[in-house]
Amino acid sequence: MKFGTKAIHAGVHPDPATGAIMTPIYQTSTYVQDGVGNHKGYEYSRTQNPTRHALEKNIAAIENGKYGACFGSGLAAIDCVIKMLNPGDEVISTNDLYGGSYRIFKTIFEKYGIVFHFVDMQNTTEVERLTNENTKIIWVETPTNPMMNIIDIAAMSIIAKKVGALLCVDNTFATPYLQTPLDLGADIVMHSVTKYLGGHSDVIMGALVTSDEKIANEMYRIQNSSGAVTGPMDSFLVLRGIKTLHLRMQRHCENGEKIARFLKTSAKIDKVYWPGFESHPNHLVAKEQMRGFGGMISFTLLGNNLDEALEIVKKVKLFALAESLGGVESLIGHPATMTHASIPKDVREKSGVVDSLIRLSVGVEDAEDLIEDLQQALA
């Protein structure tokens, strides 16, 4: 079954009671049983809910996985993965990852004895150097947020398997429309569903997908025990959003390319970060493991002036200055003071998140209007 067909049909069926083609919103906390232990598959909505269940099957299918689990946020999904570890276990992570991921690793889990290493994963030698018998997870973002670095998923899988570690890939930026990490050797795929999967800036949600039954059992145990689940209304909204994911991603990619190439021509801009450029250091890896280059772009200004960057993000009219990404509307952000503010200045600058870095989430509007907006802001 092709991607667009799966996005619309996987995991969902007409309601047996009414024939409703859309999955009903089962807005209930509990379920009546015919007798003790004699239920219809559902007992309590923290453990499982029919609307959420349909979404979990849908997301698993579009990621070419067997098991899906949805959570109250992307960070709750990350929380579930790290709770699979024990004190003394080690995690090797991308060094320019999302600030919220860095924060939960460093300020929540580090004090429980879990060791985190942050490295440039474009350099596989450095990753291999850090692996040891205590390495339990290799955590990958690709493309990375916000530097758009590309990590070779298949290469990371080989390294992880050598030491018996799990490879977890944050696939938020690419979505399964552009890449399916499980097919490249990943053990777990993570999403901030809030972004492209939901696609309409109206839901906070996270998801995990795996094809390993043992991992899935642990994932569901933690999901139920910790209780950071998503609700039926949000599940319904995401089921609806995913039905157009393939259509939206086509437009995000088209617009992203047009805007990246426009930014390259601006006299005010120093560097443009977008994996579709042949000059991108890992362009060939992106070409190999992705089916397109996405709608996320970052750029820096000549002179690296903070005030100038803040002025530009205020001058735009169509691009909205806001956190988040992946919605149908275009957003602009300043990572150093927004998404990556929780990362110490010296650490973020070492990974490229300098004061003038601006990140764009290119939406599905007409590209010409978006370019015109950027032109006037950069003038």
What are these regions (language model features)?
Residues T30-V32, T210-I215, I242, L301-N305:
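Short loop segments at secondary-structure junctions
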Residues K2-G4, A10-V12, K271, G326, ...:
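Positively charged, small/polar-rich N-terminal and surface patches that mediate targeting and assembly
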Residues H9, Y67-K268, Y273, L284:
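Conserved PLP-enzyme active-site core in the AAT-like
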Residues K106, V115, K136, R248, ...:
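PLP-dependent enzyme catalytic core of the Aspartate aminotransferase-like
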